[in-house]
């Protein structure tokens, strides 16, 4: 499985969304 620069950018973008959603959920839970 060879990864091109586009694949890496897509993976980083996806991870960024997951992390941002995770932090948002944690923050909402803390301040609920």
Curated annotation (Swiss-Prot):
Domain of life: Viruses
Entry keyword set: Host membrane, Membrane, Transmembrane, Transmembrane helix, Virion
Membrane topology: Single-pass membrane protein
Subcellular localization, as worded in the UniProt entry: Virion; Host membrane
GO CC aspect terms: host cell membrane; membrane; virion component
InterPro entries referenced in this protein's UniProt entry, alphabetically: Inovirus_G7P_2
Transmembrane spans: 8-28
Pfam families the record matches: Inovirus_G7P_2
Function: May initiate with G9P the virion concomitant assembly-budding process, by interacting with the packaging signal of the viral genome. The assembly-budding takes place at the host inner membrane. In turn, G7P and G9P are present at the end of the filamentous virion that emerges first from the bacterial host.
Family to which this protein belongs: Belongs to the inovirus G7P protein family.
Name recorded for this polypeptide: Tail virion protein G7P
Organism: Salmonella phage IKe
Organism placement in taxonomy: Viruses, Monodnaviria, Loebvirae, Hofneiviricota, Faserviricetes
Gene: VII
């Amino acid at each position: 499985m060879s990864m091109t620069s586009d694949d890496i950018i897509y993976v980083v973008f996806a991870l960024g969304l997951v992390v941002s959603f995770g932090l948002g959920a944690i923050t909402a839970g803390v301040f609920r």
